[in-house]
């Protein structure tokens, strides 16, 4: 499937699951999820695959490894809502644990979209490297921030 954008039905599904956040509702609407959410996200991952491989040939590109699950782990939270009302995609080295890995991410929610690059959790070694690079070339960091602010990217 070629990526042609996220249809309005994707956001509508997120809104609907937000207000009908239960297993019965999801099962009744599983086909909508597959068509309006899962398929466009998988196409998005496939569309970005060549660019991600050009950045890092070891990038994980299998959709089931890159895409967040809609079903939440509610074991250790007060909010027992079983489903998310948004989804995200993470690109990182294949086989690396999420914690401490550098990753590219994209998130889509009813409130908008967000993307970036960063790490999950604390990684002292990586932060030390980043700090040294900022100190060595602060203009590069300032330019990147200014450019992102001016262009909205």
What are these model-derived regions, one by one?
Residues 19-32, 98-110:
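Hydrophobic/aromatic-rich, well-ordered segments within soluble, folded domains that form packed cores
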Residues 75-137:
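Aromatic- and glycine-enriched beta-alpha-beta binding-site module
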Residues 145-153:
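Single conserved hydrophobic/aromatic residue that forms the stacking wall/gate
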